From Swiss-Prot:
The lineage of its organism: Bacteria, Pseudomonadati, Pseudomonadota, Alphaproteobacteria, Hyphomicrobiales. The keyword Ribonucleoprotein applies. This is Large ribosomal subunit protein bL27. It comes from Bartonella tribocorum (strain CIP 105476 / IBS 506). Keywords: Ribonucleoprotein, Ribosomal protein. The keyword Ribosomal protein applies. Residues 1-22 are annotated as: Disordered. Pfam families: Ribosomal_L27. One of its GO terms (molecular function) is structural constituent of ribosome. Belongs to the bacterial ribosomal protein bL27 family. GO terms for biological process: translation. InterPro entries: Ribosomal_bL27 (IPR001684), Ribosomal_bL27_CS (IPR018261). It comes from the Bacteria.
Amino acid sequence: MAHKKAGGSSRNGRDSESKRLGVKKFGGESVIAGNIIVRQRGTRWHPGDNVGIGKDHTLFALSEGKVSFQRKAGNRSYVSVIPMVEAAE
C-alpha cells in the first residue's frame, strides 16, 4: 500500500506576456506623423488636436510637432500635437 500520494503537476505556473502599454512619447517630445504616443486599454487619454486613435485605443500623431498633455472639462486627459512653426526661407 502506498504511503505517499502520487505527485500531480502544479496547477499554477502560467503567465501572460506583458503588453508594453503606457506613454511612449512624453510632453514636450518631438514627433512625426505616425509616431505612437500612447498605448492603452480603453481611453485613459483622449485624442486632441493632430492626434488619431486606433481600434485598440492607441493614440498616434497625425502631423509633425511637439506632444502636449492637458486636462480639460469633465476631468478628461487629452493628448495633442502642437505643430512646429517652420522657419520661412
